[in-house]
Amino acid sequence: MKIEKAQADFERLINKHSFTVTARTIDSGIPVYHRVWNRENETLEIRILLSGEYPLMTVRRNGAPDPKFIRDYRNPKSAFDTIRKIITAAGFEM
């Protein structure tokens, strides 16, 4: 996948799913996007950025990192498919 296509796909999915910029990487200033889902006793936060053509994602549950989801994905669509599965499994809606 070309970087331009990955960037366009990533931006489209970020906007479609209401992610917002929360920070920028120190070394290169790449925006880090996030979205938080809340309910009474549970918080789920997903942070994602695009490094070249590869999305990098982390998941935090109740403020603690969930290490099994700190990884990169081959393209924006596969990252957002995984996000959808995580959100659904946790009982939230995308």
Located regions from the model:
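General beta-strand recognition
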Residues: 32, 45, 56-58
